[in-house]
A protein has these predicted regions:
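A short helix-loop-beta-strand connector motif used in the catalytic cores of GNAT acetyltransferases and
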Residues: 58-73
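Acyl-donor (CoA/ACP) binding surface of acyl/acetyltransferases
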Residues: 1-40, 71-174
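Short, intrinsically disordered/low-complexity patches at protein termini
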Residues: 50-52, 61-64, 105-106, 161-162
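Short, conserved alpha-helical segments within structured domains
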Residues: 45-49, 70, 133
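Conserved GNAT-fold acetyl-CoA-binding loop/helix
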Residues: 38-58
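Hydrophobic alpha-helical core bundles mediating ligand binding, dimerization, or RNAP-core interactions
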Residues: 28-33, 53, 57-60
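Intrinsically disordered, low-complexity regions enriched in Ser/Pro/Gly/Gln/His and often acidic
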Residues: 8, 48-49, 57, 65, ...
Length: 174
């Protein structure tokens, strides 16, 4: 497992990854109930309360013990920006990234940091992302090197799966 707090510096921000259990649960409730965020989360719902946040956080954090990877809390310039990382989905390490709208412009830098860890220190052979069919603006994922890899249903919701291998990664990611 990676260290619990890692910092990545670039010209614009200080990016830190921490355990989800280090975040105030009210911040997670606020993020996961944000109407703009919910539009991007087909499995999300606006009734995500404090009790659900605590249970959800424990389940996400337990993936580190069970699979050797899991999602992190993401901080940008010492502010909670969201959560993301690799989470177990149907046998795959699936990349999830949920950011507060104030931080949506930071997604690519966070993605690069996660993918680099996945293929170096974590030794992943591939990672996936799942997108709902309603997400039609997806040219960017192909530029990053993702390839179509079938479809899956999770909790009754249909997703398209895309897979990234180290050898298909775009040079802009490495």
């Amino acid at each position: 497992m990676l260290s619990l707090v890692e910092a990545v510096f670039n010209l614009r921000m200080l990016l830190k990854f921490k355990r989800l259990t280090e975040v105030d649960p009210l911040d997670i409730v606020s993020l996961n109930n944000n109407p703009d965020v919910l539009l991007q989360m087909p499995l999300g719902s606006a009734n995500f309360d404090l009790a659900k946040a605590k249970e959800w956080t424990q389940q996400k954090d337990a993936q580190w013990q069970q699979y050797g990877y899991g999602p992190w809390a993401i901080f940008i310039d010492q502010q909670f920006a969201g959560w993301g990382g690799l989470q177990y989905e149907e046998g795959d390490a699936d990349l999830a990234l949920v950011l507060h709208p104030n931080f949506w412009g930071s997604g690519k830098a966070i993605f690069i940091a996660i993918v680099k860890r996945a293929f170096t220190s974590m030794g992943m052979e591939s990672i996936t992302i799942l997108l709902p069919p309603s997400r039609t603006r997806i040219k960017g994922i192909f530029r990053l090197g993702f390839q179509p890899d079938g479809e899956v249903d999770i909790e009754g919701t249909h997703f398209q799966r895309f897979r990234l291998y180290p050898h298909t990664m775009a040079r802009s990611v490495t």
